[in-house]
Amino acid sequence: SAQRVRNIRKRRSISQEKLASMSGVSYGSIKRFETTGMISLLSLTKIAMALDMADELRDIFTSVPYRDIQEVINET
């Protein structure tokens, strides 16, 4: 999530400008992402790589999808 990225960035004392330079994602895109949570998949991937969070990003996309609505209901 955007909040998680912001927290990691701040914990590592990385400014939004520095993250932009590290990731190749524009400062405006990073600022917008941290404010609204909206970002392209490509930019999110670049940010994840720059912050060494690629494994977390991969985990999002490798989760097993639900087979039916009952699985969703059972999980809640």
Predicted feature descriptions by range:
Residues 1, 12, 37-40:
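Flexible coil/turn residues that form the inter-helical turn or adjacent wing/linker of helix-turn-helix
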Residues 3-19:
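Short basic helix-loop element that most often maps to the first helix and adjoining turn
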Residues 5, 16, 27, 41-44:
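Helix-turn-helix DNA-binding elements, focusing on the entry/boundary residues of the two helices
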Residues 24-39:
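Recognition helix of helix-turn-helix/homeodomain-like DNA-binding domains
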Residues 36-49:
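Short, basic-rich loop-to-helix N-cap that marks the start of a DNA-contacting helix
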Residues 39, 53, 65-66:
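Residue-level marker of structural boundaries
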Residues 58-76:
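Short, charged recognition helix plus adjacent turn
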